[in-house]
């Protein structure tokens, strides 16, 4: 079920005015995400998310090579599926910290405040978004434009899905952000299939390690 853009914008206006989240103007999963964001102190007026230091980001990326290496072959596939729309494919760890970003030059390098590796995307920091919310919901989630909790993410529509290891534990999130909300329906199944492919890569890597 989707809600008109005007309803979502009105929900945001009401929240910023009186601190109340209207239950009748938001999808159920978005209401839950906003409530979590509010309770954890996310700032709805933020124009961008906080980041780790350069050194901490470098260390995190180095310690997450297994996840990045498994996901990267699927980045270009997802990017091609989006087509000419402005977009970015993003990968995070299980703490919602971005590890890698792939997409068109305009979106990634020329959009002020666009998330980069080391960006903190948990709902506590960045509010409802295509990384932190799938992690909190433990399932595929879409965040369309103004459904994002912080204003800086409103130009984008995002969808994300958790990545799980052999034990079923969430180890990261795979997400796509696009400026056009119209592409999300055709990308949903592709994103989920890519996530399954990455999870299969985890299994293959572990089997190869056992053989050695």
What are these regions (language model features)?
Residues 78-79, 131-132, 147, 160:
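A generic local secondary-structure boundary/capping motif
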Residues 141-153:
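Membrane-proximal, non-catalytic sensory/regulatory domains of signal-transducing membrane proteins
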